[in-house]
């Protein structure tokens, strides 16, 4: 008996009301060569009772002894997936019947692609379509397809535009790229897409709504638009940009940022090349991106780059950059500006004490 072609992986937690519908949508796929792997994150409701009502032999259940969060539960899914492909779906979402068929057909015909996504229809807690939010999410998540280098440029400047719940990927690609980073609480999906593209895999969006994404009341979704979520997302997005520091050649940098000023394929030593790449990444973040987290990332990167032996001389020789320019740049550090504004009386007091010395 041959192994199935795809693992439908369902990280599950306290979704007793919805998990049955999610499992049934998997069982109803037009493509039937699959196993269903459910990893329950120590649910405290009757989710497990609902799961165990399904007697299909293709269902495999792993129950965590303690609650670990969606990232780690998804990682357990990936680690335990044994088939060629893996489809990750939340335990309150619904797969359209042709989802697996269409996504697997694409990957089977395009061997250089590591993952394929789709659009999604937004439904409420009762399964009713929210047309307004579906239209909004269509604009966000059904972007024009492009090469992995072009995706990387988009991710760098604009952040995520991929519907994570629609993922179907090569299992080997996810295992090679590494797990979801559980320390990245809001942008762990973007973090993985960037690493996947940097690893050399192309990604693709099928512009059909192959998933029903459930938006819960009372901000119960991980991605709900709350103040806390927005703060965490800004923090995460700055950290996610650090993935771009893995770019090790000017050739790759130019493929991602072909319009970058000052980038040229002349000969440098390995040490010089890395300093120049990091400086060019600083420039991309500092001058060409609109968000404060880009500026915070850029200023921190410039500081780290200038710690390297000979960095100031290399940057001065190739870009005319000097220490006076660095001093001007760090005064625009968003965190510093914010702290100075919040603590203006204290800052003035400290400054006066220094001036007396």
Language model features: what each stretch is:
Residues 25, 40-49, 66, 90:
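A conserved acidic beta->alpha catalytic loop
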Residues 86:
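Short aromatic/hydrophobic "clamp" motif used to bind/position activated sugar donors
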């Amino acid at each position: 008996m041959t192994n199935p072609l795809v693992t439908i992986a369902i990280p599950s937690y306290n979704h007793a009301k919805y998990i049955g519908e999610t499992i049934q949508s998997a069982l109803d796929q037009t493509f039937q060569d699959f196993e269903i792997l459910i990893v329950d994150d120590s649910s405290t409701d009757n989710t497990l009772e609902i799961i165990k009502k399904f007697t299909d032999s293709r269902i495999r259940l792993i129950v965590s002894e303690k609650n670990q969060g969606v990232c780690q539960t998804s990682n357990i899914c990936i680690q335990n997936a044994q088939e060629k492909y893996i489809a990750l779906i939340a335990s309150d979402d619904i797969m359209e019947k042709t989802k697996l068929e269409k996504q697997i057909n694409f990957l089977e015909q395009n061997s250089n692609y590591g993952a394929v996504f789709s659009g999604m229809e937004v439904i409420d807690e009762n399964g009713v379509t929210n047309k307004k939010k579906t239209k909004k999410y269509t604009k966000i998540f059904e972007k024009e397809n492009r090469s992995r280098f072009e995706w990387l440029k988009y991710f760098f400047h604009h952040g995520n535009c991929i519907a994570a719940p629609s993922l179907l990927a090569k299992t080997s690609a996810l295992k090679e790229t590494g797990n979801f980073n559980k320390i990245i609480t809001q942008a762990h999906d973007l973090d993985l897409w960037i690493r996947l593209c940097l690893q050399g895999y192309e990604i693709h969006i099928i512009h059909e709504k192959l998933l029903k994404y459930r938006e819960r009341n009372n901000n119960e979704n991980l991605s709900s638009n709350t103040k806390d979520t927005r703060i965490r997302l800004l923090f995460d997005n700055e950290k996610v940009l650090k993935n771009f520091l893995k770019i090790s050649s000017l050739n790759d940098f130019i493929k991602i940022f072909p319009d970058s000023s000052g980038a040229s394929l002349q000969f440098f030593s390995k040490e010089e090349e890395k300093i120049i790449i990091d400086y060019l990444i600083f420039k991309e973040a500092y001058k060409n991106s609109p968000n404060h987290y880009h500026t915070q990332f850029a200023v921190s990167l410039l500081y780290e780059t200038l710690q390297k032996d000979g960095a100031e001389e290399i940057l001065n020789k190739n870009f005319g950059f000097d220490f006076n320019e660095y001093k001007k740049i760090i005064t625009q550090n968003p965190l510093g500006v914010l702290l100075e504004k919040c603590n203006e009386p204290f800052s003035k007091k400290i400054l006066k004490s220094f001036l007396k010395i």
